[in-house]
Structures are given as C-alpha cells and as structure tokens.
Amino acid sequence: MNDLIILNKPYGVICQFSAHEKHQCLKDFVEKPGFYPAGRLDTDSEGLLLLTNNGRLQAQIADPKFKQVKTYWAQVEGSPDEVKLDLLRRGVDLGDFVTRPAEVRVLEEGEADVLWPRVPPIRVRKSVPDFWVEIKISEGKNRQVRRMTAKAGFPCLRLVRVAIGRLNLFDLNLELGQWQFAPHRP
C-alpha cells in the first residue's frame, strides 16, 4: 500500500510541508511529493500522523462523519477521579461544541514507559501528582483532547496519539521521526 504513510511525529513539528521559521515541518521528515496530512496533530502533540496522496482516503480518515476512532495517551495533572473521568465518557461541553462521548481508561503504572522521552521534557512539579489516561474519540477538532481534559480538571502535560483505527504506533515499531508506508487501512 503506497498511498498512505505513517509518521511518528515528534514534539515541536508543525503539520505542514512549507518551511516555518520557528518549527521543523513535515518536509524535514517525509520527502514524498503529493502527500498531505490526513488530519493534524498540534505542534505540541506527538505520535501517529497519517499522510496520503488519495483525497477520498484523506476524507475517510479526517472527516468526523466517518467516525474514525483516534486513540490518545495523555499525561495529565491530578489524581484519577472517576467522577471527573465520567465527564469525559459522557461528552464535554467546551462552549463552542459538545464532544461525543469518549472511551476513557487510566493507564496502569509503567504502561506509558514504552513511550520515548519527550524533548524538551515536560515540566515536573513535585507537589502536583500526574497520571496517564487513554482517550478514544471519533472526532478531532482543534486541541480537543487538551480542552476536554482541562475542562474535566486534568490539565494536559503531554499528548501522544498512539492509534488511528487499526493502525497502532506500537505495532509498527516506528522510532520518533521515522515513517513507513501503512501495511493496511485504518
């Protein structure tokens, strides 16, 4: 399958191919003419990013009407609280829209150790606990996961997209900044 690329996007990379004065861009990692992101990841988010040269496929991946499930691991401030986590599970009113219900689970201690170290490292406050949560959503509006966790009382420290549909970053063994053609559709 040579119309779909999977990139393990590093922190600080902007999701465009044109050069940017402050950030690295996709062209610094993928030099394949005609490929464009199927959805985006914020500059301060990391992980699985799909690129394609197929417009129909791009729409199937990025358009919320197709309900493609995207899985994120978020390191958040606070301690697990089921009442707050249930807010994410029911859907969150963010003011400009209400999110669809999300699947949410707290990661086991050490489960996020499979992730690479972030450069630069996140700020650590010894007096404020943090934990990792997995959030699965079928939409992907601007900064949605960060806004959802903040609204639930868990400010987001680090956000990594680990899967889109059946494409899982850990199954692919992609190092940070590496890419490969997708073995199958999401």
What are these regions (language model features)?
Residues 1-186:
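RNA pseudouridine synthases
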